[in-house]
Amino acid sequence: MQLDPGLVTGPEMYRFLISAVVPRPIAFVSTRARDGALNLAPFSYFNAVSSVPPLVAIAIVDRPDDPKDTLRNIRETGEWVINLVDEALLPAMARTAGEWPRTTSEFEVAGLTAAPSERVAAPWVRESPLDRKSVV
């Protein structure tokens, strides 16, 4: 299949890319806002990009008029945690995927434990088998 990026819409390109890159790892990203509000959200545009130094990348769609809480928190603090999602965590992760008010903690929505991190202010998901603390 050939696809000319100049001839398709953004949503069409998105659907193509998410169906073409499989299996797609999920970054379950936890952040803390400057005011202390917690956020937890899944992102499917995520991957490891280097082992030395260890680097990962996530892509968050920017909504100029109303940025996602995850992006807003990373911009405010420069810190986030990527939590690994295993099969047991899938139902809880799915509950966090909706649009929630900024003051709503998706940890509570999903029934997950926000565990304190040692190196960053953002908590990690205690139920996750692996996490990666990150700083911009």
Regions flagged by a language model, labelled:
Residues M1-N39, N47-V136:
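Active-site-proximal mixed secondary-structure blocks
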